[in-house]
Amino acid sequence: MKNDVIAARYMPAAVEALKAFPINPSRMELVMISENVTFRVTNGDDGAPYVLRLHRPGYHTLAGLNSERIWTGALAEAGIATQAPVLTHDARYFHQVDIANTGEQRYAGMTEWVEGTVISDYLGENASLEERKRCFHQIGALAATIHNQSSSWTPPAGFERPSYDSDGLLGEAPLWGRFWEHPGLDRADTVLLQRTRSQIREVLRDFQTASTNFGMIHADLDPANVLVQDGRVTLIDFDDAGYGWHLYELAAAAFAEIEKPGFPDICQALIAGYRDIRALSERDLTLLPMFLLIRGMALIGWISERPEIDNTDLFREVKEWTLASCASFKSPM
């Protein structure tokens, strides 16, 4: 769907949502349609930029969205840069609006706009292997810092976020969708995915979930969600944050590079950065290839759940790699 069509569909609701926040908008532009419909808003009083998101209906409850804000605030207190929230006039994180053109109801939330370049754009297509290794070393250290915070943090009563456990990743209703039912798969593909899914669930059944390897994670630590500006790193887009294995976090970070030259070196840099901050056992590390495969499956489900977004090329690439990995999968335990 073209951006001008999306803007026309959601702009009236965005304008209405802004009335709930202490912002005097002078300009608003659509910047992204993915999980959410995201606008950049300029405050007419001082020219400061902000982010307004209309959150995907049905993906999170209001309690879940509020919990996201609670955790990003806790991360900020621990020294991890995140986007600071903007509260409504009556001190709430979110305001519900009706989307007249679709009949939807969406929660609108605002944060400060953070200047910078996401690492995926910073690297582009022509970055050297050494530069890519340096960036992924930094991402690994960031992941470890997140996990250090979450493993020592006690969520408040009522805290609600999804769990990327065996059921959340590979159960009958995975958080990112029933990947084996994507319409672009044939029967043989589906059989292969189902068989491998069952094999991996057997492995996960024996893999402990302790504070040393499982807890609150960002869950989408893709280089596109890490901003850099003058050496400062800011983590953005916590829409998928929840409880999960730390290895899934690392797999999510590495997956974008999986078909690029030097991928083993990228993984080594990621792990080295992580181990600079937090321990990661060799036994757990042997499961990273399996978690990369889980990430591939999850992405197929994510694409299947969002037919309104043209992900034709992404689906083809992820499908090819994931099916090949399923065909060669052997239980690591």
Regions found by a protein language model. Give the residues of each.
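All-alpha amphipathic helical-bundle segments outside canonical DNA-binding/catalytic cores
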Residues: 134, 280-292
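Active-site catalytic-loop/activation-segment of kinase and kinase-like phosphoryl-transfer enzymes
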Residues: 1, 159-206
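Active-site acidic catalytic loop and adjacent metal/ATP-binding pocket
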Residues: 34-47, 51-52, 85, 198-247
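ATP/Mg2+ or Mg2+-diphosphate-binding catalytic cores
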Residues: 299-333
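Protein kinase glycine-rich loop
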Residues: 29-32
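Active-site activation/catalytic loop segments of kinase-like enzymes and analogous catalytic loops
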Residues: 246-279, 295-310
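Juxta-kinase regulatory segment immediately upstream of eukaryotic protein kinase catalytic domains
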Residues: 1-25
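ATP-binding pocket architecture of kinase catalytic cores
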Residues: 42-154
